């Protein structure tokens, strides 16, 4: 089914963001794990995999609309050098995705592509869940300090990899 070029463009823009998020969350997972934040690292790993599933849905939709998914470029990574910077970097990426998906859903609605609009609605709901989690973690970090936050997010030695 031939899709609207503007919709395919927006789907590829979302793919650009999701592919960057996959890489950013995965690198943050590895860094956090190395720093001893094993529980938070596990969450970052899960987020990376979820973003990969988002990318897969976008690729599927682009192909269905007879477009070509652009996997050649990904959004620039924001890599934190400590736990606070990791959370802030991830939050900035989620804010960017939310803004893009809101705009994309409106374009899809105007062009009558309600299935792509629904996909953007699903992505938007997931990104807002990520935003809530990250904002909560940053609030918690500010309230209890990095040392206590580290204790909450470190697994006991016998559970660590």
From Swiss-Prot:
The protein's required cofactors: heme b
Taxonomic superkingdom: Bacteria
Domain Ferritin-like diiron: 1-145
Principal EC category: oxidoreductase
Binding site for Fe cation 1: 18, 51, 54, 127
Gene Ontology biological-process annotations: intracellular iron ion homeostasis; iron ion transport
Amino acids binding heme b: 52
Family: Belongs to the bacterioferritin family.
Name of the protein: Bacterioferritin
Source species: Brucella suis biovar 1 (strain 1330)
Protein encoded by which gene: bfr
């Amino acid at each position: 089914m031939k899709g609207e070029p503007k919709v395919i463009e927006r789907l590829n823009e979302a793919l650009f963001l999701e592919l960057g998020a996959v890489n950013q969350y995965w690198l943050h997972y590895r860094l956090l794990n190395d720093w001893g934040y094993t529980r938070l690292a596990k969450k970052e790993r899960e987020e990376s995999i979820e973003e990969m599933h988002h990318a897969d849905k976008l690729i599927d939709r682009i192909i269905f609309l007879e477009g070509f998914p652009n996997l050649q470029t990904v959004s620039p990574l924001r890599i934190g050098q400590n736990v606070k910077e990791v959370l802030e970097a991830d939050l900035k990426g989620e804010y960017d995705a939310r803004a893009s998906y809101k705009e994309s859903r409106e374009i899809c609605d105007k062009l009558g592509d309600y299935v792509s609009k629904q996909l953007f609605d699903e992505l938007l709901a997931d990104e807002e869940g990520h935003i809530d989690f990250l904002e909560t973690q940053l609030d918690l970090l500010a309230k209890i300090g990095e040392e206590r936050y580290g204790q909450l997010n470190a697994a006991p030695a016998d559970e660590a990899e």
